Design a protein with these regions (language model features):
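Negatively charged linear elements and acidic catalytic determinants
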Residues: 1-102, 301, 336, 481-494, ...
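Mid-to-C-terminal secondary-structure elements
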Residues: 5, 185-209, 218-356, 429-433, ...
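Membrane-helix entry/capping segments
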Residues: 54-99, 127-128, 140-145, 180-183, ...
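Alpha-helical transmembrane segments of integral membrane proteins
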Residues: 67-98, 340-347, 376-403, 407, ...
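Short, strongly hydrophobic transmembrane alpha-helices
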Residues: 94-121, 125, 369-371, 417, ...
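Small-residue-rich transmembrane alpha-helices
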Residues: 116-117, 336, 374, 410-480, ...
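Short juxtamembrane loops and helix-capping segments at transmembrane helix boundaries
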Residues: 118-138, 267-284, 328, 337-346, ...
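Interfacial "coupling" helices/loops that link adjacent transmembrane helices in transporter permeases
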Residues: 369-413, 775-817, 821, 871, ...
Length: 884
């Protein structure tokens, strides 16, 4: 009851403030009057009695303030007073306010952008019901995220921990809705996919397990909301319409809800089809291949009460069963759980490392901004030392002054945070619609949600309190009588030491960021000059899937040969070859490889997992891949000829021990087929620029037909002219075949996309750090010059040379620059392990990097000190002495 009574009283005081102030004024005056009456009765004159009573009473304003606080309503009123005072002070210093707000906006905006990406891709679960219980499955020591279809069926039917398990795979297809045929991306999914995720359609219905009755038995598609909106203009009559996928009829069953875009965070398909129709989509049937495990990703909801550890144990018992039952196909069947969305550790690991490292660097930017503003606030408090001393002498409490300083700091930080958040939202909208890889369904679904807003608010408040705390020591150790007596507006306490420390911290952070930026640039340059195993220059790519136009089997091979011959006939074309998957951009399929003497073809007995490509005879000529030994394929290496392969040098070393004995030797594939090595080519990069040398084998396409292919057209003609000739040539062969034409160099940019993004991100942070460093050094130098103008004038009047004047004015700033740069460079070198996760071939100990950092910091110092130096040298001693 006492608490409620107190609360009611405090609320009442907010609405009766004027009345209570009047009553308090009367009471205080009455108190002083009574004391004066007592003194007058003791013999003092009336005037002297009133004066003595006021002296005994003390500061009238302070007593009034204490009474108001005791009444409980002053706090809110004083907060508004502090806010009004802070706004007034900021309006009086528009330059300081603009610099402070811009500094914080850059720093908090950068942190908001990085955190929004981290939140969208890593922290936030998929947008499905009960997402916290949704897990994906990884397998084996390498934590592969894909399974074969038969293994998936066993996992689904034999586990006791999941409500259901669904599987999915990304594929491309040609679609004809009645207009011009075009390419599209889809997810091939099991019939229980939508049921397992517990989502409901926006329009129509989903397909279910009951719709699957064998291969090609469920010709249905479910559209994403975005595809329905873009291609069918929100036509609700689309349900039941028949469209052509690879010239096979499929019926539209429904439209998914607007918020659901699939189960891979960065891949947005156009629609979903049942996986049992995989042969119609991809032109081949791998559903019965138990050993073909590089295909399906699996996920499902844990049953209520089942822990992840229990689920892993349950899955491993199924894995033990599979190893015993199918020893030839299933090995290393140990399982792990992962959060779905980023395809497990294969992509999730590097992505988490990159974004975490980027978040740390963005945090350093914010720390540098706080150091910058802390230094400015210390200088600002120093310039207001006389004002603060007078207020203290007149009875103001130090805590009230500090509260006003903190209010000013927090107000600036909130304004800067709001501006930075607004800028980050604008940038995030651009990132959301940006397609980094135009030929792939990849985008960054980043949005500013409550987590981002909360993080921005938290960083704003923390920043305000952090740099607002810098002048605390100065205020608490101020001797008002000494300051007033000396008439100084200069030093307060030991502010120089604090400002020096803040500047060193700021410069050190800048040096770390500049080091990171230069390391990223050097890493990217090394990437661009790596030995890819092919030459992208002067080569065009024609990418298509013949299955999109209804070609399969021998018809697809015949059409591929016709396309190669027709393109070779174009004037200026030197060679044309095809490959089923481009190195780096699409990665490659891998296959277990066994020695020729091995009869036990279980995966555990494989001597290597080799990258596998299917190529036409002239691919190596078109790609400019160097043949080291043996021969390349011919069109006679068909399905009626002995199985042959061309391998790379690493394959020869790993399988045969030496390239000298590899040509003519045999090895076995996963299916037991004996394959003879007929040639050896140079090593290259196949799945990643960061990979160690990998074994790779190339098989003739006539012995292993593929519908999907990329034609490499090597020419000495202008790419734009050649593109027009290629387009007309392909359309003459089949006007209904979807295809794209790009330069190989442009396509390779997709493989370099992670390195480019890392370089760009670190470069932006490095520039921001440099800007903050310039402002910090400039502020330090300008403040030093302004406070020592009279001293500099006297020195010049006494004959000091310009160099001595500059040393006096700026020597301290450059010493701090040297200390901070050395500390930052050392920290940048020690951060090599972190940088290695962010940038390929990151080597901070590179002499060019070290020299570049030293040069960059020296240039930054000279740039920042230029204006203060000019001011110091332009001092007219006669004018200063006359003013004195």
């Amino acid at each position: 009851m006492k608490l409620l009574d107190s609360l009611r009283f405090r609320i009442a005081t907010l609405f009766r403030r004027s009345q209570m102030n009047a009553e308090m004024e009367d009471e205080l005056r009455t108190h002083i009057q009574h004391r004066a009456d007592d003194l007058e009765r003791s013999g003092l004159p009336r005037v002297e009695a009133e004066r003595s009573a006021r002296i005994e009473f003390g500061s009238y304003s302070r007593v009034k303030e204490e009474c108001n606080e005791a009444a409980g309503g002053t706090f809110v009123e004083s907060v508004f007073q502090d806010l009004r005072f802070a706004f007034r002070m900021l309006r009086k210093s528009p330059g300081f306010t603009a610099v402070a707000v811009a500094t914080l906006a850059l720093a908090i905006g950068a942190n908001a952008v990085v955190f929004a990406i981290l939140n969208s891709l890593i922290l936030r679960p998929l947008d499905v019901p009960q997402a916290q219980s949704l897990y994906g499955i990884e397998r084996g020591k390498d934590k592969d995220v894909t399974e074969s279809y038969p293994d998936y069926l066993d996992l689904r039917d034999r586990n006791r921990s999941f409500d259901d398990l669904a599987a999915y795979n990304v594929a491309s297809v040609g679609i004809d809705t009645g207009n011009n045929p075009s390419g599209a991306w889809l997810l091939e999914v099991t019939g229980n996919y939508f049921d397992a995720l517990a989502i409901q359609p926006y329009l129509g219905r989903f397909f279910h397990s009951a719709d699957e009755r064998g291969p090609n038995s469920a010709p249905y598609i479910v559209l994403t909301y975005a595809y329905w909106h873009a291609h069918f203009q929100d036509d609700r009559g689309v349900v039941g319409r028949v469209v052509q996928l690879n010239k096979h009829p499929f019926t539209i069953l429904g439209v998914a809800p607007v918020e659901f875009r699939g189960t891979i965070s960065f891949v947005f398909p156009d629609f979903w089809v049942p996986i049992v129709n995989q042969e119609q989509i991809e032109g081949t049937n791998w559903l019965n291949e138990r050993g073909n495990r590089g295909l399906l990703m699996v996920l499902g909801h844990l049953k209520t009460g089942v822990t992840p550890a229990q689920a892993v144990s349950d899955l491993n018992s199924v894995g033990t069963y599979l190893e015993k039952t199918y020893p030839k196909d299933d090995g290393h069947m140990t399982f792990f759980l992962m959060r779905p969305g980023l395809t497990g550790d294969w992509l999730g690991g590097p992505m988490r490392a990159f974004l975490t490292g980027l978040m740390l660097l963005a945090g350093l930017i914010l720390l540098a901004a706080c150091a910058n503003l802390g230094s400015l606030f210390a200088a600002r408090a120093s310039d207001r030392s006389r004002e603060i001393a007078l207020r203290l002498a007149l009875g103001s409490r130090p805590m009230r002054i500090l509260r006003q300083l903190f209010t000013e700091a927090v107000l600036i930080s909130l304004i800067g945070g709001a501006v930075g958040l607004w800028g980050s939202i604008v940038l995030l909208r651009g990132l959301t619609v940006w397609r980094p890889l135009p030929t792939a369904p990849i985008s960054l679904p980043v949005h500013a949600d409550a987590n981002v807003y909360g993080m921005a608010l938290l960083l704003s408040l923390a920043s305000g309190f952090l740099f607002g705390a810098v002048p605390v020591r100065q205020v608490l150790h101020t001797d008002p009588y000494q300051v007033i007596k000396s008439g100084s507006t200069g030093t307060l306490g030991r502010r120089i030491t604090v400002r020096d420390l803040l500047l060193v911290v700021q410069i050190a952070i800048c040096a770390v960021l500049v080091t990171s930026s230069l390391v990223a640039v050097r890493g990217l340059m090394r990437s661009l000059h790596s030995n890819f195993g092919f030459e992208p220059q002067n080569a065009m790519l024609v990418e298509t899937a013949l299955s999109m136009a209804g070609y399969s089997g021998d018809d697809a091979l015949t059409m591929q040969k016709r396309m190669i011959d027709a393109l070779k006939a174009i004037p200026g074309v030197q060679s044309v070859g095809s490959v089923d998957r481009l190195p780096l951009y699409y990665g490659a399929n891998d296959s277990n490889v066994f020695t020729d003497k091995t009869s036990d073809l279980r995966p555990s007995n494989a001597v290597a997992d080799a990258m596998m490509y299917k190529i036409s005879p002239e691919y190596f000529d078109a790609a400019h891949t160097t043949l080291l030994a043996g021969r390349i394929f011919t069109w006679h290496d068909d399905k009626n000829s002995p199985r042959v392969a061309v391998i790379n040098r690493e394959f020869a070393r790993k399988i045969f021990g030496s390239a000298a004995i590899a040509v003519g030797s045999y090895f076995k594939m996963r299916d037991g087929t004996r394959t003879q090595v007929v040639g050896i080519v140079e090593d290259g990069k196949y799945a990643s620029l960061a990979e160690d040398p990998q074994p790779a084998m190339f098989l003739p396409v006539l012995q292993s037909p593929k519908s999907e292919m990329s034609l490499v057209v090597r020419s000495n003609r202008d790419p734009q002219q050649l593109a027009a000739a290629i387009k007309s040539t392909v359309q003459e062969l089949d006007a209904g075949l979807p295809f794209t034409i790009r330069t190989w160099s442009r396509e390779l940019e997709s493989a370099l996309f992670p390195s480019r993004m890392a370089t760009l991100s670190l470069g932006v942070l490095g520039v921001m750090g440099a800007v903050l460093s310039i402002t910090g050094i400039f502020g330090m130098a300008a403040y030093s010059v302004s406070k020592r103008l009279k001293e500099l004038g006297i020195r010049m009047a006494l004959g000091a040379r310009p160099r001595e004047v500059l040393h006096t004015a700026l020597g301290r700033a450059f010493k701090l620059l040297a200390i901070g740069s050395a500390a930052g460079l050392l920290l940048g070198i020690l951060a090599s392990r972190v940088l290695a996760f962010i940038v390929y071939q990151a080597t901070p100990r590179d002499p060019l990097v070290l020299g570049g950092v030293v040069l960059a910091m020296a240039l930054l110092g000279l740039l920042a000190a230029w204006i203060p130096a000019q001011r110091a040298l332009s001092v007219d001693p006669m004018i200063l002495l006359r003013e004195e």
